[in-house]
Amino acid sequence: MLQPSAQGSYSKAVLSTFRSLEDLTCDGSKIILDGQSLNVSSVVAAACHQVPASISKDPQLHARLRESVELLARKLAEGEIVYGVNTGFGGSADTRTDDYSTLQQALVQHQASGVLLPTDRSSSRPSSRYPHGLRSHSMPTAVVKAAMLVRCNSLLRGHSAVRPEVIEHILAFLRSGLIPVVPVRGSISASGDLSPLSYIANALEGNPDIAIQNEATGDVIRADEALQQLGLAPLRFGPKEGLGLLNGTAFSAGAASLVLFEANQLVLLSQVLTAMGTEALAGSTGNYHPFIAGVRPHRGQIEAAGNIFHFLRDSRMATSPGADGASHSSSLAQDRYALRTASQWIGPQIEDMSLASEQVHCELNSTTDNPLLDPGSGHMHHGGNFQATSITSAMEKTMSAMQMLGRMIFSQCTELINPALNNGLPPNLSFDDPSLSFTMKGIDINMSAYMAELSYLNHHVSNHVQSAEMHNQGLNSLALVASRYAAETVEVLSLMASAYLYALCQALDLRACHLEFLRNARSTVDSLTAELCLSFSPLLSESDQRQIQDSTWEQLLHHWNRSSTSDLHDRSRNAASHTMGALVELLPMQLNEATALPTRLAPQQQWLDEVSATLAGSYDATRAKFQSNPTTPFYLCSASRRMYEFVRKGLGVPLHRGIVDHPTYPSVTEEHAGQELIGSQVSKIYMALRGGVFRDVLQDCWYSSDSVRGFAGEELVLASKL
């Protein structure tokens, strides 16, 4: 028999990055750069958590740096033509000069041509004279920091003839939180990210027109003032150092690393959300059975199915194939596609994101300059390692994965909110009567807006390449543009995931309350049905009576679910009335034919009245008790329970009780004071997701479910790359 495969390398690798980041952010941790071992976790640690970086003391590394500088000096002494050192740049490389230092200044001068707003270059607030609200034109600080780290690591490989002190200057800025203000647009990532990197090079020169932001205080000073604060002298570049600083993919690779870290988190979260959705909709665990994935053995599908199947193994809400109540003649024989094909949908995204992770890791530890110096052979090579197409490829896969996961979440969420599809849950997931409460209707609309925007963003940037720079750069990767738009897809999918998680917690509460209601009401309804049976046939056998009770309850539950759009009193009456007809057909008519019609109808009317009252009273009592003592965790699988309790307890996002939770609703009790908007509650989830707070609970979901069996002690190649 095929066994569940929850040992997927992708999940392990992503979880490994979480642990790696935790280790790096411990007090006293430091990133050691050696040109060989930089990973995404280290980039995130430096860019987002102020973890300092320094150069390895490995003597071989320092020897490589020295030898590359010496090799270039020999080539120039021998009169060799070296692009960008004694020639012009790009389509102007037909010029020659021996004024090497001035040529490097000319390079950083002409590339610093991007647009920044006055407010980007100062500590002041945006001016009101721009009525349309100009948003910042500067690169996010975290991206600039990531680029600084990545460029240092690449230069340490010793193929660019850049002195160690140049690299140390960059790291001094980075460690002190003095970050150049860099335009967000202007790079085509062809000969690397020339324009944005030129702002870092200009900062090292002490250019007074370069703005430097103090990350700790928000103050903005000039680059020459920043050098004075650091106790550093302005640099005068060696023959190839300006080119070595600019001619690389650091901004693309740095931005891609930050995007990838969050995107991978969302891929894991989508699997937990699918498990929660399966429970909320009373779906089938059979959707994710290992046999299904095993006979179509795509690696990603096997991993996704294995994870979700393991998550659900201890659920009391999801149904199992062949279990009592798993299906009814009146319900769909199988779940709709949003759940049933989730593993087939997530699987290819896992495969794409695995490859994207490998591509970005490789780029972080690559030499992306031109020309390249090989001290070992004494040769120099003119080529195109600055073309960042691998990053473009990784980011376009990421954009596609985010859109595909968004489409799945959108389908699951809209099914959850729609009473025609959600298997008996109230419309709009309202906790109170639906005539005056429309809880998730706004989120339903929000999700449509998010989905439309996410789909718009998912267009291959590489389709829009334009020839540049005298047609010398006829091909250019647009990798930084791709990274920027991939970041947008991560943002929008994070909004969708947050809204969906809010709706899921509400739905799980409603489902649990429903199960409590069924448990409380069943015995009374069975007693009333038994009394009705005996009034028609005093000699009815116990087994026949039980059969009638079971059939009646099933019919009653069916009509209860179908009338979820009605307020409680009407819903109870409708369910009982529609069930009455089926019950009459089941009753053994053994009364004397001479018995008067009113006499025969009286027991039926009594049953109808009492069952209606029982349903309404039981549901109302259950609902009231549930508010103060929710039993939802009891029914959930381990993974769902941890995510649910994280939202409810960790983030303080409560069950939405309906109109009484509106902040301005008239209330006579203090318990209703301080209520928040639905959007404010979703915002708590969103900020926690974007702030990295979800990493711990995601790890708990995997470890608590034992979904990644054999994880401890097993090192994966992919994990080290992430």
Curated annotation (Swiss-Prot):
Disruption phenotype: Abolishes the biosynthesis of lentopeptins A and B. One of its GO terms (biological process) is L-phenylalanine catabolic process. Keywords: Alkaloid metabolism, Lyase. Its EC number is 4.3.1.24. Residues 117-136 are annotated as: Disordered. It is an enzyme of class 4 (lyase). GO terms for molecular function: ammonia-lyase activity. Transmembrane segments: none annotated. The active site is at Y83. Contains an active site 4-methylidene-imidazol-5-one (MIO), which is formed autocatalytically by cyclization and dehydration of residues Ala-Ser-Gly. There is a cross-link at A190-G192 (5-imidazolinone (Ala-Gly)). The modification 2,3-didehydroalanine (Ser) is found at S191. Gene3D superfamilies: Fumarase/aspartase (Central domain) (1.20.200.10), Fumarase/aspartase (N-terminal domain) (1.10.275.10), Phenylalanine ammonia-lyase 1, domain 3 (1.10.274.20). InterPro entries: Aromatic_Lyase (IPR001106), Fumarase/histidase_N (IPR024083), L-Aspartase-like (IPR008948), Phe/His_NH3-lyase_AS (IPR022313), Phe_NH3-lyase (IPR005922), Phe_NH3-lyase_shielding_dom_sf (IPR023144). Pathway: Alkaloid biosynthesis. (E)-cinnamate binds at N247, Q334, R340, N370, K441, E469, N472. One of its GO terms (cellular component) is cytoplasm. SUPFAM superfamilies: L-aspartase-like (SSF48557). Phenylalanine ammonia-lyase; part of the gene cluster that mediates the biosynthesis of the ergot alkaloids lentopeptins A and B. Within the pathway, lenB provides the cinnamic acid starter unit for the synthesis of the N-acyldiketopiperazine intermediate by the NRPS lenA. Cinnamic acid is condensed with the Ala-Val-Ala peptide chain by lenA which leads to the N-acyldiketopiperazine intermediate which in turn is converted into lentopeptins A and B by the cytochrome P450 monooxygenase lenC. Belongs to the PAL/histidase family. NCBIfam families: phe_am_lyase (TIGR01226). This is Phenylalanine ammonia-lyase lenB. It comes from Aspergillus lentulus. The lineage of its organism: Eukaryota, Fungi, Dikarya, Ascomycota, Pezizomycotina. The gene is lenB.
